[in-house]
């Protein structure tokens, strides 16, 4: 909103007011989150890009013979939530490392909660190196399906409050 004020001497002053809240800076302990449900279409699209056509992802009988309840979502597809969460809040972030531990299977239709928590940060050459704890949960956030740690280089610590798709 732009407001005009005219003083007695005829001096015009323009003032700008913004309805945007003040910036939130990332600090150690902050948690960013996103939920997602993976579909059969997601599995197919991922396989086309990765060339991972393992029958566990496409054939329910193969999955059952291997000891699973049904077709599996690719673990790497589920873990792609982590860079998505970070880049949604920090445009221009460079994802430099990720460790992953696959704890439990994810099936098509499971609602997955992805969390990244800042556990360390340091400034270097006008950028920030941030280490994150990364976790995905299912079953109403009770069961850890993936955990690990990620490191990203952020251009600044200003967090976008909503991801671009929201």
UniProtKB/Swiss-Prot annotation:
Establish whether keyword Protein transport is in the entry.
no
Transit peptide as recorded in UniProt: 1-17
Known pathway: Lipid metabolism; fatty acid biosynthesis
Q: What is its main location?
A: mitochondrion
Annotated tissue distribution: Expressed in leaves, roots, siliques and flowers.
* Record-level GO cellular component terms: mitochondrion
The Swiss-Prot or TrEMBL record annotates one GO molecular function as: (3R)-hydroxyacyl-[acyl-carrier-protein] dehydratase activity
Report the EC code(s) recorded for this entry.
Answer: 4.2.1.59
MaoC-like domain spans which residues?
Answer: 34-125
Superkingdom of the organism of origin: Eukaryota
- Gene Ontology biological process: fatty acid biosynthetic process; photorespiration; thylakoid membrane organization
What is the protein's known function?
3-hydroxyl-[acyl-carrier-protein] (3-hydroxyl-ACP) dehydratase required for mitochondrial fatty acid synthesis (mtFAS). MtFAS are essential for photorespiration and plant development, probably by influencing mitochondrial membrane lipid composition and other lipid metabolic pathways.
Name of the protein in its database record: 3-hydroxyacyl-[acyl-carrier-protein] dehydratase, mitochondrial
Q: Which source organism?
A: Arabidopsis thaliana
Q: Which gene encodes it?
A: MTHD
